[in-house]
């Protein structure tokens, strides 16, 4: 279900501060965040985020195709292990 247009896009204010600081600096250190609900904006392109999946932080490199999506979409929380085949 998509977000209402009258509400607008959402990004955590502390995450926006970190992005502005990263864009101003030369170092390309990953930005660690727990905010999976934040939407990806155009000024995030080219940055690397460490998104928490509930257990560990997964590195996500943001490209232009990701704009408008949420950070959490690129850090899966569940890992499916294949069903074992019955031995005969």
Curated annotation (Swiss-Prot):
Gene3D superfamilies: 30s Ribosomal Protein S19, Chain A. GO terms for biological process: ribosomal small subunit assembly; translation. The keyword Hydrolase does not apply. GO terms for molecular function: rRNA binding; structural constituent of ribosome. One of its GO terms (cellular component) is small ribosomal subunit. InterPro entries: Ribosomal_uS19 (IPR002222), Ribosomal_uS19_bac-type (IPR005732), Ribosomal_uS19_CS (IPR020934), Ribosomal_uS19_SF (IPR023575). Keywords: Ribonucleoprotein, Ribosomal protein, RNA-binding, rRNA-binding. The keyword ATP-binding does not apply. NCBIfam families: rpsS_bact (TIGR01050). Protein S19 forms a complex with S13 that binds strongly to the 16S ribosomal RNA. Belongs to the universal ribosomal protein uS19 family. HAMAP family: Ribosomal_uS19. This is Small ribosomal subunit protein uS19. The lineage of its organism: Bacteria, Bacillati, Mycoplasmatota, Mycoplasmoidales, Mycoplasmoidaceae. The gene is rpsS.
């Amino acid at each position: 279900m998509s977000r209402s247009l009258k509400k607008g896009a959402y990004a955590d204010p502390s995450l926006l501060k970190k992005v502005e600081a990263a864009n101003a600096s030369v170092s390309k250190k990953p930005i660690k965040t727990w905010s999976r609900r934040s939407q990806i904006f155009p000024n995030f392109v080219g940055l690397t985020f460490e998104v928490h999946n509930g257990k560990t932080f997964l590195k996500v490199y943001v490209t232009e195709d990701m704009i408008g999506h949420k950070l959490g979409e690129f850090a899966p929380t569940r890992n499916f292990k294949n069903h074992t085949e019955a031995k005969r």
